[in-house]
């Protein structure tokens, strides 16, 4: 049975009306629409990036192209990203960046502050994420199979050599997975072993909580939003050995968690979602 021509128009208008009603009446629907568009937009930008990046082949300099394409994404959602402490980045030497990991929105803060010749270490599954995976591979992103410990250790040893010989910086999320509970998970020690093995400094970066505008658990994504990205002073690993790694990881996590609580309660990213006795003040760096 064929529909008369006007029926398709009527169905389209009905669908648009339904979507509009869901958008204005359901915060959960708005959350899913926004996240679907966010992920779809990233895949589309990756398609644009692939032919440009392919000219160089797999090259860390291609991260500049991805960053340029992704920097505007915060404006689509009315998210203001404020960066503090960027002067703490060493101007020339290699280093390991460690950052907290809350959601895929971390990409917005990362692109805002990403240093030159810095690539993330990502789970291997991302490599198969369509156009995004290919764009990431062309940008030199390092993929690790977290299920195969032996392979991961081998890759990290190679990365340590790359840091020193090719003047590359790496960005690691030491929690190992996204954390939505308004705190920080215990840190895995791979990034710290890497920094100690290469004898390069660690640069902790903290992104404030998104709870005032985003919550996966509550299916909430509102606009506008504000996020502060705080770059902490370098942590030296000079002279440290693998035996020092557990204490090093705990110390860095403690300093990052302290800053996370401060900047998530000062009205620049977390509203009052994280209460801290005595109030919040400017972090002393």
Swiss-Prot record:
Biological process according to GO: CDP-diacylglycerol biosynthetic process; phosphatidic acid biosynthetic process
EC id: 2.3.1.51
Signal peptide: 1-28
Cellular component GO terms held in the UniProt record: endoplasmic reticulum; endoplasmic reticulum membrane
Catalytic activity: a 1-acyl-sn-glycero-3-phosphate + an acyl-CoA = a 1,2-diacyl-sn-glycero-3-phosphate + CoA; 1-(9Z-octadecenoyl)-sn-glycero-3-phosphate + (9Z)-octadecenoyl-CoA = 1,2-di-(9Z-octadecenoyl)-sn-glycero-3-phosphate + CoA; 1-(9Z-octadecenoyl)-sn-glycero-3-phosphate + hexadecanoyl-CoA = 1-(9Z)-octadecenoyl-2-hexadecanoyl-sn-glycero-3-phosphate + CoA; heptadecanoyl-CoA + 1-(9Z-octadecenoyl)-sn-glycero-3-phosphate = 1-(9Z)-octadecenoyl-2-heptadecanoyl-sn-glycero-3-phosphate + CoA
Superkingdom of the organism of origin: Eukaryota
Pathway(s) served: Phospholipid metabolism; CDP-diacylglycerol biosynthesis; CDP-diacylglycerol from sn-glycerol 3-phosphate: step 2/3
Family indicated by similarity: Belongs to the 1-acyl-sn-glycerol-3-phosphate acyltransferase family.
Lumenal side: 29-34, 146-189
Cytoplasmic compartment segments: 56-124
Compartment list: Endoplasmic reticulum membrane
PANTHER family with a match to the protein in the record: 1-ACYL-SN-GLYCEROL-3-PHOSPHATE ACYLTRANSFERASE, 1-ACYL-SN-GLYCEROL-3-PHOSPHATE ACYLTRANSFERASE ALPHA
InterPro entries in UniProt: AGP_acyltrans (IPR004552), Plipid/glycerol_acylTrfase (IPR002123)
Motif (EGTR motif): 175-178
Organism of provenance: Mus musculus (Mouse)
Main location: endoplasmic reticulum
Name of the protein in its database record: 1-acyl-sn-glycerol-3-phosphate acyltransferase alpha
Membrane-traversing stretches: 35-55, 125-145
Motif (HXXXXD motif): 101-106
Keywords, sorted A to Z: Acyltransferase, Endoplasmic reticulum, Lipid biosynthesis, Lipid metabolism, Membrane, Phospholipid biosynthesis, Phospholipid metabolism, Signal, Transferase, Transmembrane, Transmembrane helix
Written domain comment of the UniProt record: The HXXXXD motif is essential for acyltransferase activity and may constitute the binding site for the phosphate moiety of the glycerol-3-phosphate.
């Amino acid at each position: 049975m064929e529909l008369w021509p006007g029926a398709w128009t009527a169905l389209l208008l009905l669908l648009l009306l339904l979507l509009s009603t869901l958008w204005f009446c359901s915060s959960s629907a708005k959350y899913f629409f926004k996240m679907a568009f966010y992920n779809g937009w990233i895949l589309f930008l990756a398609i644009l990036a692939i032919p440009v990046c392919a000219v160089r082949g797999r090259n860390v300099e291609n991260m500049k192209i991805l960053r340029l394409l992704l920097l505007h994404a915060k404006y689509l959602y009315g998210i203001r990203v404020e960066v503090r402490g960027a002067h703490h980045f060493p101007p020339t030497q290699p280093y390991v960046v460690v950052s907290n990991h809350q959601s895929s929105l971390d990409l917005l803060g990362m692109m805002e502050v990403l240093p030159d010749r810095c690539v993330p270490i990502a789970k291997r599954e991302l490599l198969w994420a369509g156009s995004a995976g290919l764009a990431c591979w062309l940008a030199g992103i390092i993929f690790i199979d977290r299920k195969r410990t032996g392979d991961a250790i081998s890759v990290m040893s190679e990365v340590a050599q790359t840091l020193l010989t090719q003047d590359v910086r790496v960005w690691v999320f030491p929690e190992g997975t996204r954390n939505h509970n308004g705190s920080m998970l215990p840190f895995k020690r791979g990034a710290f072993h890497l920094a100690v093995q290469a004898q390069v400094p660690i640069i902790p970066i903290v992104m404030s909580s998104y709870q005032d505008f985003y919550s996966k658990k509550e299916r909430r994504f509102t606009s506008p939003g504000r996020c502060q990205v705080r770059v902490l002073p370098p942590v030296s690993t000079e002279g440290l050995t693998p035996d020092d790694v557990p204490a090093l990881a705990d110390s860095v996590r403690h300093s990052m968690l302290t800053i996370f609580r401060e900047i998530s309660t000062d009205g620049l990213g977390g509203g009052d979602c994280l209460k801290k006795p005595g109030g919040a003040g400017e972090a002393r760096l």
